[in-house]
């Protein structure tokens, strides 16, 4: 085998109170990543937002992963996730490349090990090593990251709506507005929300999961960056969503809902963005299964 192609889908980190800890995989949108054995490391970026994604391996999340794995490959990324969307646009190439190189060279890394290799790639986008997007991208479902551990949890079936307004929020700038210290009562409330969310997961109760999505940290400080946030959130809940959260650093707003209400929730959210003078697009999707191999090319 001299090349391999994988699909790495979007992810949504934080889920409200699970800041830098929780994340879920979405079935769509996603990147298509082809990795070929080569004499030197190189990257080609095509697709959505390609003009703003560096091809220099030392400045690209996929490139940093290849360097960490010490493999000379040609990486072709067909981007389907808009950069600066809060949907793990930098994590998808990192996660996909880690899985592809592991398979292409038969390295034998576990999914957990691949998560931490892929997390190194996030240095190119966020300036820090963090795994809350690459973990669900690789493992699928819901993941929780704690120190050097990652846990995977299956979620009950539910619809997922991700509405992306035409507002750009970079991970670095969104992190910059967060305070280094928070009041004790806010911390207690956030911990209770995170605990309640996991109670909903254990009980497989999407209603409990949904009402636990709001928080007093990520939402409080980042929602002002999203024009129309309050009315969009209210419209989603009025249309039957279990709960709403800012996806990652934003500006995408994520709604979990009954599968048969997904399109109604998406339409209501987009309408409120439109009333606020903001163009948006919606992804009506479901919980994803993680990076998957879509093609293996054998040597001739």
From Swiss-Prot:
It is found in: Cytoplasm. InterPro entries: GHMP_kinase_C_dom (IPR013750), GHMP_kinase_C_sf (IPR036554), GHMP_kinase_N_dom (IPR006204), Homoserine_kinase (IPR000870), Ribosomal_Su5_D2-typ_SF (IPR020568), Ribsml_uS5_D2-typ_fold_subgr (IPR014721). ATP binds at residues 82-92. It is an enzyme of class 2 (transferase). Its EC number is 2.7.1.39. GO terms for cellular component: cytoplasm. The keyword Repeat does not apply. GO terms for biological process: threonine biosynthetic process. Pathway: Amino-acid biosynthesis; L-threonine biosynthesis; L-threonine from L-aspartate: step 4/5. Keywords: Amino-acid biosynthesis, ATP-binding, Cytoplasm, Kinase, Nucleotide-binding, Threonine biosynthesis, Transferase. One of its GO terms (molecular function) is homoserine kinase activity. Its main location: cytoplasm. It holds the Pfam family GHMP_kinases_N. Belongs to the GHMP kinase family. Homoserine kinase subfamily. Catalyzes the ATP-dependent phosphorylation of L-homoserine to L-homoserine phosphate. This is Homoserine kinase. It comes from Methanocella arvoryzae (strain DSM 22066 / NBRC 105507 / MRE50).
